[in-house]
């Protein structure tokens, strides 16, 4: 029997201690010399002694050879060739460039010692994409400095322009110090936060510069101008900054995969705007005073700096007078864009996160569950050739992982270094030569590949940013009866499949495994005198094989596997005619019962002890799952109401991940909203004025929706972040205008004409901050698909925020009856 052979082999493997011989002076370890060091030694192992003199060796009854593990469990294919893959992961602490450089030195050293027929190629390098992201940061930073300097020079003059521009590098340096202090690495999301903050950093500086210029113009000394500016602005600027900080804090303190993904972004934004406040209050007034002492600037009238045009000023004064004569006019003009944004929100496509801006796309395939790794590899080759022959995407290189998950080339890829997967599954990454060609033609390519492979599950898609999402549309049905769960799953699968843009669907319980089932009769086994346990062990050894020892080969320990020889073309026959020794010689296993091929569900999943059936759907590349969810919403609700007693349904997929992330964000946002209200009331010393500022926050959300609509962008998590950023910007401008109006109103009861002059005084720095912010965000529209929703929302929204500050705030102040009519 296989059991007897196994015992014989194990008994001759003497790689173990044989005891210790000791006396009062010393101890000696007793060990046997290793007797299995080659295939020949394994072949000569005695198995049985016959007639007290004849020895049956293993080579007499078995074929012994040294070969790779069969069947193969996982295969790696690179550019159509089966090769060996090595993945190296660095720790979080070292810089990726330094780590990659050190790894390359090791590889180069090894490459020089390899024979000619063996080569080493680098197929993926994370530092390349990190460098691109830093290049974007440097480019955005350079453009931001250019726009800030140019716009500030035009509107404010040379001295304010130099000072305001200096805030950018100083603030970024403070952020770098902060990241180092809290241990936040510079990666995609944290760098994104710095890029977002570039449009917000100089607002406080411009406001302080303009206020200082105003104080000097009315005759105050340098010292008094500094004191008055700081005294007047420290509370409103701190309140505005605190409002922005509280708006971003839910992203830092929330829970869930999305919050975890963008938490670094919120941290760098908070550090950026906080540093800009500190620099604006402490550094800007001092630099302005020093600038006045420089001989080159002494003859320049500080208030005359910047662009002046009396004709435009008179027309603007007339417009403000007309608007505030009937405050409803100013209100209607200022709220028209936000209201339009809210009305257009229902037309915005909804996604979770935008696509990755990398020249990579993926193809995942799943064959029937009984498919071997070799069969999956064969199908992977066919699909690879279909991609190359289509000519739709020019491929630079590609790699496939068959029978296991791919390594974590992106943070949202599940599997990583763990060897998880099945023989019937393959995952691949294709690197395109042209990113834009890839994005344009990927939808057509996905339909082509799916149409050519209707018998298997194929997913062709680009990589998305954000946390991992396993399927676009997903539901889980809970219940007790597997048969009922299967029927319900098939019914729900039809509902999902009927929706537009669905490329394929999958019900977990419909995943059928083909098995060889042996129906053994207990009576036959008992009459034969065979131990049932030995029978099962014989079956296992004959098919899967058992490890019976190891062979030392130099410094390697190779396992010895005992396995039966099966005919690959007759699996059922090999199982039926397996021989089992008995009292009367031997018996075929078919003598103890019947063998037949069966098809049964291969998966039984439970959650909290309850059976469940997962039903998933995938949409075509280039389409959004939100449209599919909206289409099937009523049918799914009807399906839910018709479920049998004891059965329930839960939505998963992208919708669940998106919902969990937004729920976590909004739940923690309530706490910070209360803190924002408290801070505004304390800063403004008025509930009504705090209410006006809060209404500005609501209007700014509508402006962000309008920006997304104009830019033809989807509303997702990045759009939500854009709305939060725009809230901070709008409140900042509005609080400053309101503080200027309050400053004049506290001296006396002002008239509408005087109100117009206060607004004109605030206009220069409001327009300057808006244009510099626009200049900071506009380049991002062309920089990356990841930033586009943010860039469009902020770029268009900031223009509406200007009208809100200059028209809405004064009009509401008039309604508070704080002026003379």
Regions from the language model: what does each represent?
Residues 1-146, 209, 486, 493-672, ...:
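Extracytoplasmic/periplasmic membrane-proximal domains and adjacent transmembrane bundles
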Residues 1-14, 31-37, 375-468, 523-541:
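Solvent-exposed, membrane-proximal periplasmic/extracellular interface segments of envelope transport
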Residues 15, 139-152, 156, 172, ...:
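Hydrophobic alpha-helical transmembrane segments in multi-pass membrane proteins
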Residues 123, 130, 134, 209, ...:
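Helix-loop junctions and hydrophobic alpha-helical segments within the transmembrane domains
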Residues 146, 150-213, 678-750, 755-761, ...:
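Hydrophobic transmembrane alpha-helices and their membrane-interface caps
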Residues 198-210, 233-253, 260-303, 428, ...:
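Transmembrane alpha-helices and their membrane-interface boundaries in multi-pass membrane transporters
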Residues 233, 302-354, 400, 475, ...:
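Signature of alpha-helical transmembrane segments and their immediate interfacial
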Residues 251-260, 335-371, 413, 460, ...:
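Transmembrane helices with small-residue packing motifs
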């Amino acid at each position: 029997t296989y059991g007897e052979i196994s015992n014989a082999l194990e008994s001759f493997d003497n790689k173990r201690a044989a005891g210790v011989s000791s006396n009062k002076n010393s101890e000696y370890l007793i060990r046997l010399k290793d007797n299995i060091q080659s295939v020949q030694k394994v072949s000569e192992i005695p198995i049985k002694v016959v007639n007290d003199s004849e020895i049956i060796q293993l080579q007499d009854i078995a074929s012994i050879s040294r070969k790779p593990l069969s069947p193969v469990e996982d295969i790696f294919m690179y550019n159509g060739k089966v090769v060996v893959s090595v993945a190296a992961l660095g720790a979080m602490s070292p810089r990726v460039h330094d780590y990659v450089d050190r790894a390359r030195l090791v590889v180069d050293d090894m490459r020089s010692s390899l024979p000619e027929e063996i080569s080493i190629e680098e197929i993926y390098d994370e530092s390349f994409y990190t460098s691109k992201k830093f290049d974007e940061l440097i480019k955005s930073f350079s453009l931001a400095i250019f726009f800030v300097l140019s716009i500030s020079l035009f509107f404010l003059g040379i001295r304010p322009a130099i000072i305001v521009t200096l805030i950018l590098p100083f603030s970024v340096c403070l952020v770098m110090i902060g990241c180092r202090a809290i241990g936040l690495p510079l990666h995609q999301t944290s760098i994104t936060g710095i890029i977002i903050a570039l449009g917000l950093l100089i607002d406080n500086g411009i406001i302080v510069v303009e206020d200082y210029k105003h104080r000097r113009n009315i005759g105050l000394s340098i010292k008094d101008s500094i004191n008055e500016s700081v005294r007047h602005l420290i509370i409103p600027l701190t309140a505005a900054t605190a409002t922005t900080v509280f708006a971003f804090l839910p992203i830092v303190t929330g829970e869930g995969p999305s919050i975890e993904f963008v938490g670094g972004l919120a941290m760098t934004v908070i550090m950026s705007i906080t540093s800009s406040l500190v620099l604006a209050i402490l550094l800007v007034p001092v630099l302005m005073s020093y600038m006045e002492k420089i001989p080159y600037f002494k003859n320049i009238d500080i208030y005359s700096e910047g662009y002046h045009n009396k004709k435009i000023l008179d027309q603007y004064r007339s417009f403000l007078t007309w608007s505030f004569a009937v405050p409803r006019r100013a209100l209607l003009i200022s709220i028209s864009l936000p209201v339009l944004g809210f009305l257009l929100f229902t037309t915005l496509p909804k996604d979770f996160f935008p696509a990755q801006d990398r020249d990579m796309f993926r193809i995942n395939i799943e064959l029937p569950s009984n498919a071997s790794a070799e069969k999956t590899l064969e199908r992977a080759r066919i699909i690879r050739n279909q991609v190359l022959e289509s000519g739709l995407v020019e491929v630079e290189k590609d790699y496939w992982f068959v029978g296991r998950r791919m390594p974590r080339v992106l943070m949202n890829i599940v599997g990583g270094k763990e060897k998880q997967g099945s023989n019937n599954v393959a995952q691949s990454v294709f690197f395109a030569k042209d990113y834009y060609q890839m994005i344009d033609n990927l939808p057509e390519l996905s339909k082509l590949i799916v149409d050519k492979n209707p018998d298997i599950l194929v997913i062709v898609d680009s990589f998305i940013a954000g946390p991992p999402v396993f399927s676009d549309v997903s539901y889980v049905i809970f219940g007790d009866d597997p048969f009922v769960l299967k029927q319900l799953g098939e019914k729900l699968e039809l509902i999902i499949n009927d929706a537009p843009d669905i490329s394929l669907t999958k019900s977990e319980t419909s995943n059928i495994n083909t098995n060889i089932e042996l129906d053994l009769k207990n009576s036959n086994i008992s009459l034969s005198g065979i131990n049932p346990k030995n029978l099962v062990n014989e079956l296992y050894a004959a098919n899967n094989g058992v490890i019976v020892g190891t062979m030392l080969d130099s410094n390697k320990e190779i396992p010895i596997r005992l396995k039966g020889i099966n005919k690959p073309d007759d699996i059922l026959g090999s199982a039926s005619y397996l021989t089992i020794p008995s009292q009367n010689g031997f018996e075929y296993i078919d003598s103890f019962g019947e063998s037949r091929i069966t098809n049964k569900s291969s998966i039984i999943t439970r959650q909290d002890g309850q059976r469940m059936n997962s039903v998933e759907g995938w949409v075509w590349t280039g389409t959004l799952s939100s449209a599919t969810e909206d289409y099937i919403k009523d049918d799914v609700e009807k399906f839910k109401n018709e479920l049998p007693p004891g059965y329930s349904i839960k939505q998963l997929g992208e919708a669940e991940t998106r919902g969990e992330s937004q729920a976590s964000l909004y739940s923690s946002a309530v706490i910070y909203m209360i803190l924002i209200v408290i801070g505004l009331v304390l800063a403004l010393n008025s509930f009504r004025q705090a209410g006006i500022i809060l209404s500005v926050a609501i209007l700014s959300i509508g402006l962000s929706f309008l920006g997304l609509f104009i830019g033809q962008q989807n509303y997702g998590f990045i759009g939500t972040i854009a709305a939060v950023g725009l809230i901070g910007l709008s409140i900042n401008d509005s609080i400053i205008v309101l503080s200027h109006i309050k400053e004049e109103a506290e001296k006396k009861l002002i008239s509408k004409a005087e109100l117009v002059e206060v607004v004109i005084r605030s206009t220069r720095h409001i327009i300057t901050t808006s244009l510099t912010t626009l200049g900071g965000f506009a380049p991002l529209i062309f920089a990356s698909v990841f930033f586009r929703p943010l860039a469009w929302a902020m770029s268009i929204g900031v223009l509406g925020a200007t009208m809100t500050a200059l028209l809405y705030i004064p009009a509401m102040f008039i309604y508070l009856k704080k002026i003379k009519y």
